[in-house]
Amino acid sequence: THFVDQVASLAFLAAHTRTLRLGTGIVILPQRNPVVLAKELASVDVLSGGRLEAGFGVGYVPDEFDAVGVPFSERGVRTTEYIDALRALWRGDLSFSGRFTSWDGVEAHPRPVSPSGPPIHVGGNSPATYRRAVLQADGWYGFATTLASTANALEAIRQNLEALDRPADRARIQMSVTPSEPVNRDLVRRYEDLGVDRLILVRDFRDTAGAPHPERATAVLSFLADTPTTLGLD
């Protein structure tokens, strides 16, 4: 895709912001080496003072999986295992035994700022994603949603909460979405009424691709600074 790498982008943002939460929406987790990714994300978390929120998804483009040598049919089970592996590395577990990744006597550094690691959000709109949100994640993220599709997703998550045993150390699932329609104050309130905790807005910066670095940085940071005022939420 035309998107720049998420971890590199977060490192840039960590250096240019002080209080902004930093997240990925989303890293295609089964395409990554979880041991390497654990170090990369923990490094961003440390450099940002604990502001990282890690967003993961399973992916949906078979050609991408062919290119990295990962069977497309394994993307779900790999995602489930890799989330467990990331948490184990961030906790400091010295061993892990899985179908796709294992280690013994390995200690990962740096450790994230929080002993429990950064919050993990899972993205997607499938029954498996809703189960994963309940059993493994701290939050769910919906991209290009409508009010109707968000209501359906939140209801599916609530049903899974009733049917499954959510780990006792997990707090309430945080609901985040990127709406597909133009955002205004009324739409914000309607998403809030549904039970959404956070709206994540998207700005396409491809129009700045040929500009000098200072101009690109200004475009990104101006968008971040102006967004609350644009929504009428300042």
Language-model features, listed with the residues they occupy:
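Active-site-adjacent structural elements that line small-molecule/cofactor binding pockets in enzymes
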Residues: 1-234
